[in-house]
Amino acid sequence: MFDLEYQLKNLPDKPGVYLMKNNLGEIIYVGKAKILKNRVRQYFQKSQKHSEKVKAMVKNIEEFEYIITDSEIEALILECNLIKKYRPKYNILLKDDKHYPFIKVTLAEDFPRVVSTRKVTKDGSKYFGPYVDGSSVKDIIELIKKTFPIRTCKKNIVEGAKAIRPCLNYQIGLCKAPCAQYIKKSEYREIIDDVIKLLSGKHLDIVENFKLNMERAAENLEFEKAAMLRDKINIIEKIGEKQKIILNNFDNEDYISLYSDGKDTCFQVFFLRNGKIVGREHFIIEDTFDTNSSTLISNFLKEFYGGTAYIPKTIYVPNIEDEALLEQWLTLKKESKSTIKIPIKGEKKNILVLVEKNAKTTLENFKLKYLQEKALYDNVLKDLKNILRLQEEPIRIEAFDISNIQGFDSVGSMVVFEKGRAKPSDYRRFKINTVKGADDYKSMKEILTRRFQHGLSEIKSIQDRKLEFSSGKFSVFPDLILMDGGKGQINIALEVLNTFNIDIPVCGMVKDNKHRTRGLIYNGEEIIINKYGSVMKFITRVQDEVHRFAISYHRSLRGKNSFHSLLDDIPNIGEKRKKDLLFNFKSIDNIKKATYEELLSIPSMDKKSAECVLEFFK
């Protein structure tokens, strides 16, 4: 039994991290403190004026634990790591934990490549970015590949190594084939230097050089070469237009502000690179209530920059808590100086005002759309409750479907809708294990049995404090089950539920002869729902989604299996021998018919491997 009063009295006079837990043992909040005893006790002092969010959290605190650290900066680093690990309910959590893409030039390699990455490391490479729009990175890299003959393979190519046969890219002029040692390291590096110039905003120098070569080619009547250079000039100029870059000797700035309406908050981030706004991002955090803006921004910075690969040179905010500590943390992460500034007037202040205005507009538009959707979904759930005569509105709905082709690779899918909205994070896939051939009823029985067995097992683990509630994949049960089928599928579901003594209403979604949603089957009778337009659309959407999810899983399994060959199952037949056998015999059937002598005639085959093939196909 946790003795709250005793634990509060014995809190240490040291820096550290505290973890608040609810009655299920779940971590609902992680915080850091300069002095643990002062900070943790504040939550339980009635004299303290807490925000509504903190009051709601304190009501749910059943116990807490703490970790002592040597310094406040260590506590901050640990706090960020624990928030990322546990995703506590009452911490500010960004639903979109983005790592923005960069263009990476792998300068540590003898023959560098140009690739996209979301992780910046000290590996000797040169990075350009981040790019808020991922498609821009893809477009720029594709244009670079068309313009500069650089390699795209992942091979470890070293100058002076054994030459290998070049790929098709060499044949069509897209690569200089360093793998075949057709180009020296120094010559290849000259090409890479041009790529770096282009990505560094110095494309005009390259264009000038290409124009001179184009004019020379035209004077020498080499019109094809001149046309090719003209096309490359157009591509380079296009990259120059697209390229919004980071240069180490220019200002790289993020502007962060927020707007709160008393309940929810919208954070808006503007990214400025080389004096230009190259992108923006917003994050809406619900139920912040009356938490002060400096606390919100401090918590937002920890979450946002804890999950991004790039930290700018300067971050501008309207106000903030723990400014010096956060600067120290950002500098440690960046491995070079990063500064937080609060502008009072001038251009920087004006940009922050613009950022706040955008946050306000974004939140208002979100609320308007949310309220419209909420009203629509509320009506759908009310109508569904009335149509089926349910006791409560079906807040959580689970739908199930089976997919197979002629009995092969049977799979099951479960999709979830909460409050009328799809909840992909709760979707589940099942590979059928116990059923041979195409038997949808037995397959459905298997996946439903597994779903509720897992659920009951998780609930017991949660009750025994062996599993956190938020970690459960099946512990939340639905208010309504929708089966993609008629009475047969409904009966299977009811049979499984009765086995586990679970009482959940089950509906069947039926289609007409044109495979369009027709109605629902419930309690043995069909209910026509076409007069309920919004319900009809909702059921159709659920039916289409569960079918799509099942089909996509089935295709992915088929795709994996399509790469498997019978030859993979033969002992002593590796990738090389498999390729040689198929190249010489053209098909599996011909390999089956091959004699011992014919198999041995393949250079990579020996007596043992030939015997293995004959034994396998005997």
From Swiss-Prot:
SMART domains: GIYc. It comes from the Bacteria. GO terms for molecular function: DNA binding; excinuclease ABC activity. GO terms for biological process: nucleotide-excision repair; SOS response. Disulfide bonds: none annotated. Residues 13-92 form the GIY-YIG domain. It holds the Pfam family UvrC_RNaseH. InterPro entries: DisA/LigA_HHH, GIY-YIG_endonuc, GIY-YIG_endonuc_sf, GIY-YIG_UvrC_Cho, RuvA_2-like, UVR_dom, UVR_dom_sf, UvrABC_protein_C. Residues 204-239 form the UVR domain. It is found in: Cytoplasm. The keyword DNA damage applies. Its main location: cytoplasm. Keywords: Cytoplasm, DNA damage, DNA excision, DNA repair, Excision nuclease, SOS response. GO terms for cellular component: cytoplasm; excinuclease repair complex. The UvrABC repair system catalyzes the recognition and processing of DNA lesions. UvrC both incises the 5' and 3' sides of the lesion. The N-terminal half is responsible for the 3' incision and the C-terminal half is responsible for the 5' incision. Interacts with UvrB in an incision complex. HAMAP family: UvrC. Belongs to the UvrC family. This is UvrABC system protein C.
